[in-house]
From Swiss-Prot:
The chain crosses the membrane at residues 182-202, 254-274, 349-369, 376-398. Residues 97-106 have a biased composition (Polar residues). Systematic vaccination of individuals at risk of exposure to the virus has been the main method of controlling the morbidity and mortality associated with hepatitis B. The first hepatitis B vaccine was manufactured by the purification and inactivation of HBsAg obtained from the plasma of chronic hepatitis B virus carriers. The vaccine is now produced by recombinant DNA techniques and expression of the S isoform in yeast cells. The pre-S region do not seem to induce strong enough antigenic response. GO terms for biological process: caveolin-mediated endocytosis of virus by host cell; fusion of virus membrane with host endosome membrane; virion attachment to host cell. This is Large envelope protein. Residues 84-115 are annotated as: Disordered. A lipid is attached at G2 (N-myristoyl glycine). Belongs to the orthohepadnavirus major surface antigen family. Residues 120-174 are annotated as: Pre-S2. Residues 2-119 are annotated as: Pre-S1. Residues 2-181, 275-348, 399-400 are virion surface.
Length: 400
């Protein structure tokens, strides 16, 4: 086996110059142990197998374009598996000779006297005479109303009809009322969810701005990835829990949350102060405190039954409580300024400068315009996370 054979080769594989890309033996046998190079090389009795020289033909085949395997491919011996694409026309279905299997024609309608015998009774003179009965008219024309005259209905029938209408109550709500009742809460929920998702992005945006201050001119990279717990390259604003920078990220976001709450509280105090609803008592002229005695509550309002709260201050004369009304606006701001001026005397030196600066209104406006033009884009990047808070502040301003 494997030596030179004097017999000429028979069957497939005679042309040994053809390459053998998939490892077939020249005699088209898969293994020498099954009779390769023997007297019976054609041991695989495939009646429709193709010959080896046809492998040089360009075809689609099961092994890709350009090669048709000798055995017909792994998909079988069909023409499609050997790369021969044929189009078989679709045979139309035979016409049905049975007309009864299709749709039947609509049968002729029976006469009205057979299908609706009650209609014949409605058209009878006896039926029209029955309609003229006062008891029957009371059902169709209550309260004596009639097209032919005033007819008093039977009392028991009318009372029965009224009792039925009283039990039924109001008519069923229309689809328009139901839709309007559901549409409002859905819009409020959608707007609230949108504002909530936008507000939750504020800490991350402020955290990115905070960390960018430490990487001026470069991209922020977490320094914890070079420590004993190596992690992949990531931003310091998205540290995983195993990163040492995770605790610093949580601390920064906690400080940012406190800052946002403080900002909302300041806005609420300013709003309540502007509407005169903060119980802040102004300083008594000539004193540094708001009360000089034990009285700190006020039992009666300053000006009648006012809805705004009042502040109770004590007179230094007889010690009786006197309710002093809160100023209409900016009482809290005035109180803070007076309190700070008492504690820090150097703030009083700024008053003339502020008054002089405010008096130069054209200069102030031009300065503000110039600063916004120069610092506007940078301020927008800093203040853009706070834009979702503006609708909340607006709602508080309108409804409080």
């Amino acid at each position: 086996m494997g030596g030179w054979l004097p017999k000429p080769r028979k069957g497939m594989g005679t042309n040994l110059s053809v390459p053998n890309p998939l490892g077939f033996f020249p005699d088209h046998q898969l293994d020498p142990a099954f009779g390769a190079n023997s007297n019976n090389p054609d041991w695989d009795f495939n009646p429709i197998k193709d010959h080896w020289p046809q492998a040089n033909q360009v075809g689609v085949g099961a092994f890709g374009p350009g090669f048709t395997p000798p055995h017909g491919g792994v998909l079988g011996w069909s023409p499609q598996a050997q790369g021969t694409l044929t189009t078989v026309p679709a045979v139309p279905p035979p016409a049905s000779a049975n007309r009864q299997s299709g749709r039947q024609p609509t049968p002729i309608s029976p006469p009205l006297r057979d299908s609706h015998p009650q209609a014949i009774k409605w058209n009878s003179p006896a039926f029209h005479q029955a309609l003229q009965d006062p008891r029957v008219k009371g059902l169709y024309f209550p309260a004596g109303g009639s097209s032919s005259g005033t007819v008093s209905p039977v009392p028991n029938i009318a009372s029965h009809i009224s009792s039925i209408s009283s039990r039924t109550g109001d008519p069923a709500p229309t689809m328009e009322n139901i839709t309007s009742g559901f549409l409002g809460p859905l819009l409020v929920l959608q707007a609230g969810f949108f504002l909530l998702t936008r507000i939750l992005t504020i800490p991350q945006s402020l955290d990115s701005w905070w960390t960018s201050l430490n990487f001026l001119g470069g991209s922020p990279v977490c320094l914890g990835q070079n420590s004993q717990s190596p992690t992949s390259n990531h931003s310091p604003t998205s540290c995983p829990p195993i990163c040492p920078g995770y605790r610093w990220m949580c601390l920064r976001r906690f400080i940012i949350f406190l800052f946002i709450l403080l900002l909302c509280l300041i806005f609420l105090l300013v709003l309540l102060d502007y509407q005169g609803m903060l119980p802040v008592c102004p300083l008594i002229p000539g004193s540094t405190t708001t009360s000089t005695g034990p009285c700190r509550t006020c039992t009666t309002p300053a000006q009648g039954n006012s809805m705004f709260p009042s502040c109770c201050c004590t007179k230094p004369t007889d010690g009786n409580c006197t309710c002093i009304p809160i100023p209409s606006s900016w009482a809290f701001a005035k109180y803070l300024w007076e309190w700070a001026s008492v504690r820090f005397s150097w703030l009083s030196l700024l008053v003339p400068f502020v008054q002089w600066f405010v008096g130069l209104s054209p200069t102030v406006w031009l300065s503000v315009i110039w600063m916004m033009w120069y610092w506007g884009p940078r301020l927008y990047n800093i203040l853009s996370p706070f834009i979702p808070l503006l609708p909340i502040f607006f709602c508080l301003w309108v409804y409080i």
